[in-house]
């Protein structure tokens, strides 16, 4: 995904306000061997790009002053109540160095799972993303979580996710193995089932 930005000359609160009034958003590019670079971006284009999941989880081609560099979106600052992006941070990517980032989770096949079909359970998505490590070339846009075999009362954990080649969970996630999805039967469904099993007097 390509992002076009411009070098930012002015600095300070007043300059940032003038840029916002002109429909621009301030940003910074850091990391790698180059010095941090202050940039400005078109606010409307950035606002729409931020609605796309891939913008948050993919390697981006950032073009500044005709020079292209590969970056990851690292931080976004929003206005507390206006539909306004105040600032964005991008980190340069080194093709030979592993990234520590978060990958979105896409949950599949809950509707055909035993939990839903046999027990009318509700499958809850406990996590929406998970921390991974990989080289930039191996970075997945998202990770699929197959729920087709989950049963009522069961949970799926981080280590149950099938990871693409070259992708691993970060050390603390691997050690903690947190729950990413769980299947629970609503209290009403349990009591209804119990009543149905009560023998007739």
Swiss-Prot record:
Domain of life: Bacteria
GO molecular function list: 5S rRNA binding; structural constituent of ribosome
InterPro entries: Rbsml_bL25/Gln-tRNA_synth_N (IPR020056), Ribosomal_bL25/Gln-tRNA_synth (IPR011035), Ribosomal_bL25_b-dom (IPR020057), Ribosomal_bL25_C (IPR037121), Ribosomal_bL25_long (IPR001021), Ribosomal_bL25_short (IPR020055), Ribosomal_L25_dom (IPR029751), Ribosomal_uL5_bac-type (IPR020930)
CDD domains: Ribosomal_L25_TL5_CTC
Keywords, in A-Z order: Ribonucleoprotein, Ribosomal protein, RNA-binding, rRNA-binding
Pfam families from the UniProt entry: Ribosomal_L25p, Ribosomal_TL5_C
GO process annotations (BP): translation
HAMAP family named among the record's database cross-references: Ribosomal_bL25, Ribosomal_bL25_CTC
Similarity comment text for this entry: Belongs to the bacterial ribosomal protein bL25 family. CTC subfamily.
Function: This is one of the proteins that binds to the 5S RNA in the ribosome where it forms part of the central protuberance.
Complex and partners: Part of the 50S ribosomal subunit; part of the 5S rRNA/L5/L18/L25 subcomplex. Contacts the 5S rRNA. Binds to the 5S rRNA independently of L5 and L18.
Full protein name: Large ribosomal subunit protein bL25
Lineage of origin: Bacteria, Pseudomonadati, Pseudomonadota, Betaproteobacteria, Burkholderiales
Gene name in the database record: rplY
